[in-house]
Swiss-Prot record:
GO terms for biological process: defense response to bacterium; killing of cells of another organism. Chitinase activity is activated by high salt concentrations which cause the release of the monomer from the autoinhibited homodimer. Residues 14-130 form the I-type lysozyme domain. Homodimer in its autoinhibited state. Active as monomer. CDD domains: lyz_i. This is Invertebrate-type lysozyme. Glycans are attached at residue 75. Keywords: Antibiotic, Antimicrobial, Bacteriolytic enzyme, Disulfide bond, Glycoprotein, Glycosidase, Hydrolase, Secreted, Signal. Substrate binds at residues 53-59, 84, 92, 105-107, 119. Its main location: secreted.
Length: 136
């Protein structure tokens, strides 16, 4: 599959999550869409552009060489997000828009329906260029 570059140097994998939505999620997760390595988050390590935890990487099909290197590679990590959404967003009948995907990413399986992921969506909407992001 072909990748789409939304900003110089950022080649997101294609899929059901729009490139704009991936960019907004990436900016929120890594403070500007950067390969920031791993850090502790709610008792376990979260890594890379999308702050992917190991169970998330396993659930997305273990793309790439390993969890940490995939998380710090923009194409591999965005492929993981796309595959995770293909697996869970449809299964849990999440809204197939940026809000549904962002909340599912933040909250895990069925996170799109959890009130605890609303704050994440509100934070994403405050990122310049991300307010009102739907599909494009």
């Amino acid at each position: 599959m072909e990748t789409v570059s939304v900003e110089e140097g950022l080649d997101f994998a294609p899929g059901m999550v729009s490139q704009k939505c991936l960019l907004c999620m990436c900016k929120l997760e890594s403070g500007g869409c950067k390969p920031i390595g791993c850090r502790m988050d709610v008792g376990s390590l979260s890594c890379g552009y999308f702050q992917i935890k190991q169970p998330y990487w396993i659930d997305c099909g273990k793309p790439g060489k390993d969890w940490k290197s995939c998380s710090n590679d923009i194409n591999c990590s965005s492929k993981c997000v796309q595959q995770y959404m293909k697996r869970y967003a449809t299964h849990y009948r999440c809204p197939l828009n940026c809000e549904g995907f962002a909340r599912e990413h933040n909250g895990g399986p069925n996170g799109c329906h959890s009130s605890r992921t609303l704050k994440y969506w509100e934070l994403l909407q405050k990122i310049p260029g991300c307010k009102g992001v739907k599909f494009s």
